[in-house]
From Swiss-Prot:
Gene3D superfamilies: Ribosomal protein S18. This is Small ribosomal subunit protein bS18. Keywords: Ribonucleoprotein, Ribosomal protein, RNA-binding, rRNA-binding. GO terms for molecular function: small ribosomal subunit rRNA binding; structural constituent of ribosome. Pfam families: Ribosomal_S18. The keyword Ribonucleoprotein applies. Part of the 30S ribosomal subunit. Forms a tight heterodimer with protein bS6. GO terms for cellular component: cytosolic small ribosomal subunit.
Length: 77
């Protein structure tokens, strides 16, 4: 008989929900940088583990911060 493999990928925890963050402020650059790649792109949910609701809030906050000049649109090489 074939043995079944145990274990697998562990589900990622939503950082925003785990830390009870109600409002994602576009001025909180340190928080937003956690969800941006080295190139300045917004990381997807499957990488960060955020819920769909919090991912939408994050996206809006990151885009606002970019327009205000707090975050770069692209990273410098």
């Amino acid at each position: 008989m074939a043995q079944q493999r145990r274990g697998g990928r562990r589900r990622k925890v939503d950082f925003i929900a785990a830390n009870h963050i109600d409002y994602i402020d576009y001025k909180d650059v340190d928080l937003l940088k956690r969800f941006i790649s080295e190139r300045g792109k917004i990381l997807p949910r499957r990488v960060t583990g955020t819920s769909a609701k919090n991912q939408r809030k994050l996206t809006v906050a990151i885009k606002r911060a970019r327009v205000m000049g707090l975050l770069p649109f692209v990273a410098e090489d």
